[in-house]
Amino acid sequence: MNIGIRQHGRWIPIAIAALGFVLVVSGVAAADRSTAPGTFVGSDLITEDVEAAAKFYRGLFDWDMAKAGDGYSIHHKGRLIASISGIEDGDPEVSRSFWLVGIVVNNLKGSISAAQKNGAEVVEKPRKVSGGYGTFAVIRDAENAPVMLIQPGKTPVGGTTGPGAWVWAELWTDDIVKASQFYTDVVGVGHEGYDRGGKPYHVFTSQGTYRAGIIEIPEELETVKPGWA
């Protein structure tokens, strides 16, 4: 549900984060977008410069921000939707800024078990968040892409709409078929395949709604590693 600064190889919570990466044109109600499997409702911007990042996103989206430890919590329309935290000095696993996204699952324990069976590594064991926001864990998927798995609690998070709301997420992968099956098994979503200019493009679906896209990394982009964007 939330993560924060990384210390001694672990993500330490500093603020409840909830980024609703959902397709707003779906017409699904906000509460559904916050709880349906495959919905993106938690994210932490891990950055080299916390203050610069906060200034940039505050100006870009007019988000409301509040200090949370050494970082910030981010609110949109009164709901907590994200957090910003700094990269720990000397952390070999994090060398540059990135958004760590979170995906809703119905059964966190079951999803972790499925992830491990499919080649994932558990980075942060399940951690309950106070305030009724639920429980989260952090894994690296079969291609080493970091992602949060979130089992929501009673307190609603994310699910906002309009300017400043999040509307989509996309997984860049070296193997679109393998990645699609991994998240189908782990998250409990379906996936549909399309042809986009002669290139395969898959979409995660749940409850009749498109949740995110999957694209295979072009051969010419040799330095791009699998990950969520």
Would you name each region that the model predicts?
Residues 13-24:
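Bacterial N-terminal signal peptides
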Residues 27-54, 98-103, 148-180, 190-192, ...:
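N-terminal beta-strand motif that seeds the catalytic metal site of vicinal oxygen chelate
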Residues 1-9:
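N-terminal secretory signal peptides that target proteins for export/translocation
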Residues 32, 68-73, 80-104, 109-135, ...:
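A cross-kingdom feature marking solvent-exposed beta-strand/loop segments within repeated
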Residues 82-83, 148, 212-213:
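A sequence-level detector of short linear motifs
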Residues 11-12, 133:
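Composition-driven detection of intrinsically disordered, low-complexity segments
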Residues 35-37, 41-81, 117, 123-134, ...:
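Core segments of cupin and vicinal oxygen chelate
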